[in-house]
UniProtKB/Swiss-Prot annotation:
Kinase activity is inhibited competitively by amlexanox. The keyword Hydrolase does not apply. It catalyses: L-seryl-[protein] + ATP = O-phospho-L-seryl-[protein] + ADP + H(+); L-threonyl-[protein] + ATP = O-phospho-L-threonyl-[protein] + ADP + H(+). Autophosphorylation at Ser-172 activates the kinase, and is an essential step for virus-triggered signaling. Phosphorylated by IKBKB/IKKB at Ser-172. Phosphorylation requires homodimerization and ubiquitination at Lys-30 and Lys-401. Dephosphorylated at Ser-172 by PPM1B and this negatively regulates its role in mediating antiviral response. 'Lys-63'-linked polyubiquitination by MIB1 after RNA virus infection, or by NRDP1 after LPS stimulation at Lys-30 and Lys-401, participates in kinase activation. 'Lys-48'-linked polyubiquitination at Lys-670 by DTX4 leads to proteasomal degradation. 'Lys-48'-linked polyubiquitination by TRAIP also leads to proteasomal degradation. 'Lys-48'-linked polyubiquitination by TRAF7; leading to proteasomal degradation. 'Lys-63'-linked polyubiquitination by RNF128 at Lys-30 and Lys-401 leads to the activation of antiviral responses. Residues 621-729 are annotated as: Interaction with AZI2, TANK and TBKBP1. This is Serine/threonine-protein kinase TBK1. The gene is Tbk1. Its EC number is 2.7.11.1.
Length: 729
């Protein structure tokens, strides 16, 4: 045990070891509170005094939630050597987190965003104080759990740090080689002397490698044999990186370098976040310091990412989930454009559904006022055009080969890889199930909305039939009036045109039978048991009641337990006979559980999901055809309504001229009677006939007017027929 005046620690209670110091878990003598105690070794005292004091001076300047806090600088009781009393971080480092098999292929998106936020926050504080860290890596980013239960990451180990302004440079070498800037790598690792000096932006390269590692679980630049076994190829990769690339991997000995500007398929970050993150990585993983972003642009771009809100969207036809990263002050027009970037559905073709209702977003509506969404309750988007089903894009990862040879080191590495693969399969199975559940929900809602559209079309057709019937009756009565006018030798040039309209209206009336037949066909397809009922969605695929994810989790727990035991066995370096036999039995169990898990994943999860996806694509294609057919029928009804309305307007104009024609008819009779000198009987007959004609015409005019009034009232009752089941925001 060692101690200072206020703290004590056990030499066996070590938290970490470095080149110049060890860190122990210590306690305050009076309170018992835990602290991290950094004790410097003999090698550290070989450094110049100013270098030894540099870490103390740097830490004294820093005070930020994302920097490990320095509480005191004390002296060890016996040696009188300086020790640092620092904030204790019980959850280890980011490296510890990435070593967990569950993070073998990168952190979950929510955790990665916390890492991004906290590292950027800590880096910004360093820059505000003119400090360059020079050894940023996952092992120097500590983790604690905050009061809200979320992780908080803090930069630590400022042994390599020094004060440096943006326009200053340095020549001394520090850092960990996998995370080193290429210029520093050349001199520090390859031992090649050059006259280059290094600026503060060398930290940005290390940050870029760290972020890529956190996002994917792997280093971005990897020679075939590994970064530390083939340093020349490593240097070739980091200096030869094309502009825009964020990774370079050599997959075979002496093979070519595979460059990529995208995250690997196994990365769990969403497409929306990757689109924002990859340009940042591409511009800070830049060997040429002239081309590399400066701190100002780095902080501006990362701050832009961190200040966005997320809107969850599910593309029904693609069968894909999306996260739309958007500023709260952006409008719906921007949202539609961002949806297009991820789904390739143009804004004019995007139909939105939220909680079973159509969602219409006013183009000026701010994103902060959109409905609240989650992964399980997103906004659904469908297209008015045919789209191919995509489904979940994921890496098809196989189990590593399990060698029968007894090897503690090899077995621990193998067990870690196996556990990582099964973790990935378990996570993928959960996502596949979520996609199927969202499809079931979306299909059910889409069927209901199409039924609403069908009812609207039936409603419109009924309205058109009634209107058409009234109009035909009006025209027929108008024809009678004009025929009576013809009897008294009055000119009625409109009669021929009215007869043509009557013929056209009868033709339109006869077309209603075809529309009715098509509507009945659509109704039968949408009805329970019909071709487009949603019963298939409940029959195909996997369901929560199958508990496939839970079954995989049970196997994963067994595998993880064996992995942790193998880690302990590796630390022992050599096992007694009985422990060795148990180790061999566990290795057999590991193989059994892993193969069973992957077989279950393949047969029960993937195969059934693929069948569900194929059925979904077929159903969506048929549904789109039905919707287009229904839209065509609706348009036909509107076209007929428009044509009937035009004829009705013409009929109304004729009705307005009838009183004048009736007066003309009366005058025409008197004028015709004067020169003929008819007998008194003939005159009486003609007068009575005209009175009767006038009464009939007045009756027709009155009836026509009443019909028009009924039509107007009917129209006002149906004007809002198309606005049901719609949320307008």
């Amino acid at each position: 045990m060692q101690s200072t005046s206020n703290h004590l620690w056990l030499l066996s209670d070590i938290l970490g070891q470095g080149a110049t110091a060890n860190v122990f878990r210590g306690r305050h003598k009076k309170t018992g509170d835990l602290y991290a105690v950094k004790v410097f070794n003999n090698i550290s005292f070989l450094r110049p005094v100013d270098v030894q004091m540099r870490e103390f001076e740097v830490l004294k300047k820093l005070n930020h939630k994302n920097i490990v806090k320095l509480f005191a600088i004390e002296e060890e009781t016996t040696t009188r050597h300086k020790v640092l009393i620092m904030e204790f971080c019980p959850c280890g480092s980011l490296y510890t987190v990435l070593e967990e098999p569950s993070n073998a292929y990168g952190l979950p998106e929510s955790e990665f965003l916390i890492v991004l936020r906290d590292v950027v926050g800590g880096m910004n504080h360093l820059r505000e104080n003119g400090i360059v860290h020079r050894d940023i890596k996952p092992g120097n980013i500590m983790r604690v759990i905050g009061e809200d239960g979320q992780s908080v990451y803090k930069l630590t180990d400022f042994g390599a740090a020094r004060e440096l302004e943006d326009d200053e440079q340095f020549v001394s070498l520090y850092g960990t080689e996998e995370y080193l800037h290429p210029d520093m790598y050349e001199r520090a690792v390859l031992r090649k002397d050059h006259q280059k000096k290094y600026g503060a932006t060398v930290d940005l390269w290390s940050v870029g490698v760290t972020f890529y590692h956190a996002a994917t679980g792997s280093l971005p630049f990897r020679p075939f044999e590994g970064p530390r076994r083939n340093k020349e190829v490593m240097y070739k990769i980091i200096t030869g990186k094309p502009s825009g690339a964020i990774s370079g991997v050599q997959k075979a000995e002496n093979g070519p370098i595979d460059w990529s500007g995208d995250m690997p398929l196994s990365c769990s970050l969403s497409q929306g976040l990757q689109a924002l993150l990859t340009p940042v990585l591409a511009n800070i993983l830049e060997a040429d310091q002239e081309k590399c972003w400066g701190f100002d642009q780095f902080f501006a771009e990362t701050s832009d990412v961190l200040h966005r809100m997320v809107i969850h969207v599910f593309s029904l036809q693609h069968m894909t989930a999306h996260k739309i990263y958007i500023h709260s002050y952006n409008t719906a027009a921007v949202f539609h454009e961002l949806v297009y970037k991820q789904t390739k559905i143009v804004s004019s073709n995007q139909e939105l559904i939220y909680e079973g209702r159509r969602l219409v977003l006013e183009l000026g509506r701010l994103a902060q006022h959109f409905p609240k969404t989650t992964e399980e309750n997103p906004i659904f988007v469908t297209s008015r055009e045919q789209l191919n089903t995509v489904g979940l894009r994921y890496e098809k990862i196989s189990l590593p080969k399990i060698h029968p040879r007894y090897d503690l080191d090899g077995d621990a590495s193998m067990a870690k890889a196996v556990t990582g693969v099964v973790c990935y399969a378990c996570r993928t199975a959960s996502t596949l199930l979520l996609y199927q559940e969202l499809m079931r929900k979306g299909v059910r809602w889409l069927v209901e909305l199409v039924k609403d559209d069908y009812n609207e079309t039936v409603h419109k057709k009924t309205e058109v039939v009634i209107t058409l019937d009234f109009c035909i009756r009006n025209i027929e009565k108008t024809v009678k009036v004009y025929e009576k006018l013809m009897k008294v030798n009055l000119e009625a040039a409109e009669l021929g045109e009215i007869s043509d309209i009557h013929t056209k209206l009868l033709r339109l009336s006869s077309s209603q039978g075809t529309i009715e037949s098509s509507l009945q066909d659509i109704s039968s397809r949408l009805s329970p048991g019909g071709l487009l009922a949603d019963t298939w969605a409940h029959q195909e695929g996997t369901h929560p009641r199958d508990r496939n994810v839970e079954k995989l989790q049970v196997l994963l727990n067994c595998i993880t337990e064996i992995y942790y035991q193998f880690k302990k066995d590796k630390a022992e370096r050599r096992l007694a006979y009985n422990e060795e036999q148990i180790h061999k039995f566990d290795k057999q169990k590991l193989y059994y559980h892993a193969t069973k898990a992957m077989s279950h994943f393949s047969e029960e999860c993937v195969r059934k999901y693929e069948a569900f996806k194929d059925k979904s694509e077929e159903w969506m294609r048929k549904m789109l055809h039905l919707r287009k057919q229904l839209l065509s029928l609706t348009n036909q009804c509107f076209d007929i309504e428009e044509e009937v309305s035009k004829y009705q307007d013409y009929t109304n104009e004729l009705q307005e001229t009838l009183p004048q024609k009736m007066l003309a008819a009366s005058g025409g009779v008197k004028h015709a009677m004067a020169p003929i000198y008819p007998s008194s009987n003939t005159l009486v007959e003609m007068t009575l006939g005209m009175k009767k004609l006038k009464e009939e015409m007045e009756g027709v005019v009155k009836e026509l007017a009443e019909n028009n009034h009924i039509l107007e009232r009917f129209g006002s009752l149906t004007m809002d027929g198309g606005l049901r089941n719609v949320d307008c925001l």
